[in-house]
Each structure stands twice: as C-alpha cells, then as structure tokens.
C-alpha cells in the first residue's frame, strides 16, 4: 500500500491513503501543524507527564471574538429562492455575450469578459462557455493578437489563458519594449495597463526573464501611482494588488474587493455588475447558513469549558479556509465537513504541540491508531475529551455518508527528536521533513472528501504520486510559516525553525535569511506555475484548483505574520468581507435594482 508521509513540528505523522475499494473507518487524518505561535504563557514549566495539569506550561488563548454572532443573524430560504430567480433572468444575457464568433475584436471582448467573470467571482456559472471560448481562442491566438498594442488588453488576455492552463507565450510582451530592450516609458502612466501587466507577470515561470522585468517595471511605477493623483478606488486597488496579487489571492476574497471597485468605474457592464451582486449575496447566504450549523455544533462540543485554554478557538476561521478551498454553492456540505475536520486538526495539534507531554501524546496517538473507544479510559481526563472529540467528528462525517476512503495515523518523531536533542539538520533535510507540516497534503486530501466519488479517487491517486506542484506549495508554506513565527518560536525555546537552521548552516543574519527566503518563495511560485501548465490537461481542473487554493490559503494566512494564530487585523478583515459586510443590504434591494 502506497503512503503519503506528513510530519508535524513536535510529532511527525504518517498517513496512509487506502485505495477507494478498501472499506474502513472514515479518514483518520494526521496531526499536522498550522502555525505554532504562543500568546501569553501561564503556569510553570514541566516535562514530566506525571505532574498535575495545573503545573503545565502552556500558552493561553482567548476565546473567539465571534461567539454566537452568526447564530443571531436572520436566514430565510425564500431569500435564496428570490436571488436564484433574479440570477437566472440575467444568465441568458451573459451567455449571449459569450457566444462564439470568429471576429477578432469580438474574440478579444469575450476574453476580457471572461476576466471579469473570474474577478467578480461568478465564472463558475459559465464554465462551458468559458472553456469553449478559450479553446477556439487559443487555436487562433496569433491572428487575434496581431497588431494589438494595448498593454491592458494583451496582459489581461495573457492572464486569462495562463490561468486556465493555456501556455500562451510571454514573447507577446516584447512589443512593449523599446530599442534599448526596456519597457517603454510611455506605459508608466497607464494605470490599468500597469496593473494588468503586474498581474500577468505573477504567472511567469523560471525561464521567462521578460516577466521578471515586467514585474519590476510595473511594481515600481504602481507604487508611485498609488500615492499620486489616482481616484481613491483605483489607488485602493493598486495597494491591494501590491499587497496580495490576484494570482495569489483567494478568488472569492478578490471578488469581494473587486465588486466594490468595479461599481465605481465610470464604464462598467451593468448586467455583469448586477449579476455579481446577486451572486455574492447568494453565496453569502449559503456561508451564513453553514456558519449557523457550525456554531451550534461547536457550542454542543463544549470544549471551551472541558479543556484548559491551550488551543486556538478558530471555528469561523476554519470555515474561511473551507470557503477558500471551494466557495461555490454546490460544495456546501463539503465546506461544513472540511471546517469540522480543520477544527479537529487544530485542537489535536495544539494538544500535541502546546500542552501534552511526550508520553501522553504517544498514548493518545496509539488510541487513535487503534480506533478503540475503550482504550480512551486509560488516558488523562483532558485527553479523554480530545479522543472523544476525535471519534465524534469522524463518526459525524461517517454518518453523513462519506466513508469510502480510510486514512490512518502513524507517529514519526523526526522533528521532535531534532528539537529535543537540539540537533541542527541541514535546511534541505528540514524542508523535506517539515515541508508538509502546514497541512498542505492533509487539507487537499480532506477537502477532496467533499467532491464526487470519481474526483476523489482521481485526486487521491494524484496525491499518492507526490506531485511536484504540491511539494512546492508545501515548501512555500513551510518557509512562510517559519518566517512569520521565527521570533515567537525562538522566544519559547522551540529551535526547529527553518530560519534558525539556515542562519546556523550558512552563517547569515536574520535579515539576510529573510531576503534569501523571499527569493526562494518566488522561485517556488514560478515552479508551481510551470507544473500547472505541464499537468493541467492530465489532472482535472476540479482537483488542480483545490491544490492551488490550498496554496492561496498560505498567502492569506502568512502575508502579514500569522493570521490563523492571531486573526485580528487583516485576517479578521477577510472574515468580515465574506461573512459580515454586505449583509445590511436586503435581498429586495437587489431584486428591485436588477432592471437595466
């Protein structure tokens, strides 16, 4: 039986993905690590499992700020029905916009519309029309692009084709260079052209120097323009893009911002804008309904009163991850299940890394491996609670009918041994072992449970092949996680951090190390782009997009420190933009404003 191996920061874990025809317990997944950053230390330090719990050193976490917020929000199924009627009334108009023709200018216009569908978060409604247009468009791309000298148009078309896996040549950007081989200065005031060029450059591979030049050229001028005389909504878009490019942002998070931007544009398509509003509201009602279910479920578990406050209370944030993984309405059940499993991973991970002693955690993992409720009686009281919670979550998922694939725990202590013995591995060794410790493989595989049987089977077989794309995403996650948590890790005596290892191995300063890691991250992103272009025809987009979305979770979480452990700030803004904002607008407002 082939296996995928996962390691956590304190207790590495190995997981076996059983073939789909093996009937066993539902998906017993490994303990892997989100970020591991302390907040306020309490009690006194001990490593003896026989000492009473009141003497434990652990980092106290406050309760979630969200509490019962989503339980109190109104929800009416009839609102969703009304929104569906309104959207259906507009769909035919948009489909007409996407009708194929051989006219060159109309082809360009349709590709630009496809970009808007993606940017506004509603491309999933028109997948067949998009695929048909891109297939025919790519076959005639030379004719279509001949003589096109608008920087924004060329950049957007490049972005669309590359995003959908078509290897459009980056040589088309040479038309914007002068005789000196540099991008012409006449483009420095073209705000939309620079924005589009900056986004196009994000999709470059390691062999495309021209896109590196494009990124440097566009970013330097955009930084100047952002603080200049641009209209406020354009300045904000520039700032958002420079902070988190669209290519690295979650599609629906970008859409929540872009809808606000697009409606302030002097020239915009009213049908597309109206549909975007209706669609976002429709999705939001789905998410709110899911959060109601999850909040009630979390309250029923009552772990906040049963366990010491050593674990992160992140149910809402776990649902945000599930939305990033798949935001479309048909994945509602999958989001609920994935959120529960991510909450479980967080609780068990924090138990292992932040509170439990080595012998205690070994007992817990043995109980999970054997999957015998009676064995839990030998555990300390707090671990009985954790073990029961583990059993309950998986049985909850099993009752929901998702019990075809089995995943089993198996402990491996590589990182724990390094940390305990103060062994300093090479950076390459650490990344090979710790590369998936930020739940990359785990989250991809868990989320596949929400797809159909064929997609799940294909996805699991692909993961078992240890694809380079996923490995690169996991390595990027390891680097960004450890950069964000270096000071906190060292402050609490946890030396198993790639920044620490790199500094010791190469004799660099912290600043030099971070600078080098940012280069490595960019190289990994190029490698992911390259792998996507290579394999997208052999692996269904439904699966590949989930892996890429997990990569976007990394950027959303670690772009400004550690958003999962300390969600206040930018991470909270993401939660609010999807689940809180726009809620004041009643459904009837959308219904009445859809007349064009």
UniProtKB/Swiss-Prot annotation:
Binding site for Mg(2+) 1: 349, 353
Pfam families: Terpene_synth, Terpene_synth_C
Superkingdom of origin organism: Eukaryota
Binding site for Mg(2+) 3: 481, 489
Binding site for Mg(2+) 2: 349, 353
GO MF term set: cyclase activity; magnesium ion binding; terpene synthase activity
Enzyme class, broadest EC rank: lyase
CDD domains listed in its UniProt record: Terpene_cyclase_plant_C1
Entry's cofactor comment: Binds 3 Mg(2+) or Mn(2+) ions per subunit.
EC code: 4.2.3.-
Pathway(s) annotated for this protein in UniProt: Secondary metabolite biosynthesis; terpenoid biosynthesis
GO cellular component: cytoplasm
Localization (cell): Cytoplasm
InterPro entries documented for this protein: Isoprenoid_synthase_dom_sf, Terpene_cyclase_plant_C1, Terpene_synth_N, Terpene_synth_N_sf, Terpene_synthase-like, Terpene_synthase_metal-bd, Terpenoid_cyclase/PrenylTrfase
UniProt motif (DDXXD motif) ranges: 349-353
Signal sequence interval, chain numbering: none
Biological process terms in GO annotation: diterpenoid biosynthetic process; sesquiterpene biosynthetic process
Keyword annotations: Cytoplasm, Lyase, Magnesium, Manganese, Metal-binding
Cofactor(s) required, per the database record: Mg(2+); Mn(2+)
KW DNA-binding (keyword) present: no
Record family assignment: Belongs to the terpene synthase family. Tpsa subfamily.
Domains (record comment): The Asp-Asp-Xaa-Xaa-Asp/Glu (DDXXD/E) motif is important for the catalytic activity, presumably through binding to Mg(2+).
Protein name per Swiss-Prot or TrEMBL: Putative terpenoid synthase 5
Organism encoding this protein: Arabidopsis thaliana
Gene name of the encoded protein: TPS05
